[in-house]
Regions:
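Cleavable N-terminal signal peptides of Sec/SRP-targeted secreted and luminal proteins
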Residues: 2-19
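Beta-strand-centric surfaces of beta-sandwich/beta-rich domains
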Residues: 18-364
Length: 364
């Protein structure tokens, strides 16, 4: 998603003048040197309308919290942006939490909303995310993910290739909480929980196992949601959907760990290679499909708000490019690492995965 918009140029040196929030070049300075004062506002955020955006990483929002109760925490809880499809296709959004110099969250808006290949089918949405404008025109992606922090947050945007002219619009919002514990579904999270985005982009060999998420030992947490997108040049078509999801807690747990699905489409609450077509439901969605002689594209998402996937000492969440069936008829698929009968010709020439995981350090 690239932007380089020229409607208004605010790329600047100061984040605010007389209460008006301006853009500035990312400088990785510590929070205590920022021009914004610590705040105890219960609701905070910003909006930028028709601004320029370049290949330079640009701060669009920064916020600091006044010290308060030990149970106090803050959240970023709303993201929305819109622009032309050409610009959106080059955009990266980053969240730097509590003085980070490497962002724990960096996303492309469509993949954050569970959509691969910039599929602009619209409108649709759930309480967590969606797209309100698109259909090949200007797109408007949003999510309401709860991104906790205790002291500070900084949000930046950046075009990853040569920017294109046009207007970029963004709205960011958050809130401060004193005693109301953050809950994801039925799971209450501690004040020091952080949301981390684990990502992968690249090829996989047939039957290769991908760590969609890999959280080291010494950490507890909760898998919130994930997105998977796969394409190939037609070889094997959708045979990669035979791949099974597993979890390992701790990460060194022996195979098969805990089996989370009996095939890829099964994990997304479908079956038979998604024979009923695309869907976008509160828990899971099948958001893109293109199957041609020389091209296969597919993407889907799933949340774990209703069926928490928790871990207590590190975590691996894995997916395999295709799978094999044991030669023992009593075992079936998903429980054989090698030596079985491969189902079809699974081909994963390019894979992108996102896993949003809440993580907090174990108590000593």
């Amino acid at each position: 998603m690239r932007f380089g918009f020229i409607v208004v140029t605010l790329c600047s040196f100061s984040i605010s003048i007389h209460g008006v929030s301006l853009l500035k070049k990312m400088d990785f300075s510590p929070p205590e040197t920022w021009s914004v004062e610590p705040s105890d506002a219960l609701t905070f955020g910003t909006g930028h309308a028709g601004v320029a955006l370049s290949k330079t990483e640009t701060v669009v929002f920064e916020h600091r919290i006044k010290p308060g109760q030990p149970t106090q925490y803050a959240l970023m809880n709303h993201f929305w942006s819109t622009c032309t499809p050409a610009a959106e296709a080059t955009l990266l959004v980053r969240y730097y939490v509590d003085g980070e110099t490497t962002p724990s969250i960096e996303f492309e808006p469509p993949l954050a909303v569970g959509v691969g290949f910039d599929d602009s089918a619209a409108p649709w949405g759930t309480k967590w995310f969606g797209i309100g404008a698109g259909k090949g025109q200007g797109q408007a992606w949003f999510h309401n993910f709860k991104i906790p922090f205790q002291n500070s947050v900084r949000v930046t945007v950046q075009a990853t290739t040569t920017p294109e002219a046009g207007g970029f619009y963004i709205i960011l919002r958050g809130g401060l909480f004193d005693t109301d514990q953050l809950k994801i579904g039925d799971v209450a999270l501690p004040p020091n929980a952080r949301l981390r985005l684990e990502k992968y982009a690249g090829p996989l060999k047939p039957l290769e196992v991908l760590d969609v998420a890999n959280i080291p030992t010494g950490n507890s947490g909760l898998l919130f949601m994930s997105t998977l997108a796969v394409n190939n040049s037609g070889v094997g078509s959708l045979n990669f959907l035979e791949g099974c999801f597993h979890m390992y807690d701790p990460p060194t747990q022996q195979f098969p760990g805990t089996l989370l699905s009996t095939g890829t489409e099964d994990y997304y609450d479908s079956g038979w290679y998604f024979n009923a077509g695309e869907f976008r439901m509160p828990v899971s969605g099948f958001t893109h499909i293109k199957v041609e002689k020389n091209l296969t594209e597919w993407s889907a998402y799933r949340f774990h708000e209703q069926d928490p996937v928790r871990f207590r000492d590190g975590f691996r969440f894995t997916w395999r490019c295709g799978d094999e069936v044991s030669k023992d008829p009593g075992v079936g698929k998903c429980y054989t690492q090698s030596g079985g009968n491969v189902v079809g010709s699974p081909t994963c020439e390019w894979v992108q995965s996102y896993a949003w995981v809440y993580v907090w350090p174990n108590k000593n």
